From Swiss-Prot:
Molecular functions (GO terms): RNA binding; structural constituent of ribosome
Protein name: Large ribosomal subunit protein uL4A
Species this protein is from: Schizosaccharomyces pombe (strain 972 / ATCC 24843)
Statement: the UniProt record of this protein carries the keyword Ribosomal protein: yes
Pfam families reported for this sequence: Ribos_L4_asso_C, Ribosomal_L4
Family affiliation: Belongs to the universal ribosomal protein uL4 family.
Note: There are 2 genes for uL4 in S.pombe.
Signal peptide location: none
Localisation per UniProt entry: Cytoplasm; Nucleus
Region (C-terminal-extended nuclear localization signal): 280-363
């Protein structure tokens, strides 16, 4: 796995590897949590929505009155007049043709969703760590088979690019242009009403270029299909994990890659650009729980599996206060306790009276 390498090579703008290397930032060793990334992405993506609602007049722009009872018809308001199909038809109700909807939507709906700050930072850390795992990038559909290594770091001279042809030449030299071709070929007409709302086409996502300082790099890369550009101080989960799926192909500039330790810190040192923030760490070092359970160290102290027990389908409930056998099974001392209570009451047995003895010995 590429994220386990202690250092990362730096590639020049002509695609050749330079002699200098850079240490792998601590954020690439953060726990990868797909569940957390998915939930945070779902919440954060809702904050870009534009409020919408139906017209307050919709379904009520007609004159209609109820005909009352006695006509063997529903009491719903009906359009008056005659000489047209519309006269006599029901109006206003949500069950009526041309009526309003039930509970018309309002613009003051609660559109935004609050997310815990530490939760968002955890999700972004996981997304950055996942961008250094080649198998996750391939599973997401990125064409990185010919990429020299992941994470991919290029020289800071790229930040000074002014022309798109320079950016395209760089992508071709580092074998990343296949991902751009994939995006260009994926452009399709959107299904549904979105075609009418200025989002006529859909296409896949390509590489994400992360820079430290903009000396022209934004203008150079912004017109390439599928390529997105972001400052390392403004890393966004919507770009690092589009659709809530981990494994975005990221191209880092050298200075941006070196700044990651200042942005995210480590598990022991706080981040410089995030107040009192420490990187999360795994509770267990090996996430393969099945392998741990089946290891010799744990199996040597675990009791052997006993015979299988079949639970009785139905057990009749018996009252131990009335059933002596059940009481004895629940509390074996109950019988001795009851006998002891009788002995310790201190009462002497009452002698039989003369009248009883006379009747007893009667011939």
């Amino acid at each position: 796995m590429a994220a386990a390498r202690p250092t990362v090579s730096i590639y020049s703008k002509d695609g050749s590897v330079s002699s200098e290397t850079i240490a792998l930032p601590f954020v690439f060793k953060a726990p990868i949590r797909p569940d957390l990334v998915r939930s945070v992405h779902t919440a954060v993506a809702k904050n870009k929505r534009q409020p919408y609602a139906v017209s307050e007049k919709a379904g009520h722009q007609t004159s209609a009155e109820s005909w009352g009872t006695g006509r063997a018809l529903a009491r719903i308001p009906r359009v008056g007049g005659g000489g047209t199909h519309r006269s006599g038809q029901a109006a206003f109700g949500n069950m009526c043709r041309s009526g309003r909807m039930f509970a018309p939507t309002k613009t003051w709906r609660k559109w935004h969703v609050k997310v815990n700050q530490n939760e968002k930072r955890y999700a972004i850390s996981s997304a950055v760590a996942a961008s250094g795992v080649p198998s996750l990038l391939l599973a997401r559909g990125h064409r990185i088979e010919e990429i020299p290594e992941v994470p991919l770091v290029v020289d800071d001279a790229v930040q000074s690019f002014q022309k798109t042809k320079e950016a395209v030449a760089l992508l071709k030299e580092i074998k990343a242009y296949r991902d751009v071709v994939k995006v260009a070929n994926s452009r399709k007409l959107r299904a549904g009403k979105g075609k009418l709302r200025n989002r006529r086409h859909v296409q896949r996502r390509g590489p994400l270029v992360v820079f430290n300082e903009d000396a022209g790099i934004v203008k150079a890369f912004r017109n390439i299909p599928g390529v997105e550009i972001v400052n390392v101080r403004r890393l966004n989960l919507l770009q690092l994990a589009p659709g809530g799926h981990l494994g975005r192909f990221v191209i880092w500039t050298k200075s941006a890659f070196g700044l990651l330790d200042s942005v995210f810190g480590s598990t022991t040192e706080a981040a410089q650009l995030k107040k009192n923030y420490f990187l999360p760490e795994n509770i267990i070092s090996n996430a393969d729980v099945t392998r741990l359970i089946n290891s010799d160290e744990i199996q040597s102290i675990v009791k052997a599996a006993g015979p299988s027990r079949v639970k009785r389908a139905h057990v009749q409930k018996k009252n131990p206060l009335k059933n002596k056998a059940v009481l004895a099974r629940l509390n074996p001392y109950a019988k001795a306790y009851k006998a002891n209570v009788k002995l310790n009451t201190g009462k002497t047995p009452k002698a039989a009276g003369e009248k009883f003895l006379t009747v007893l010995h009667e011939n």
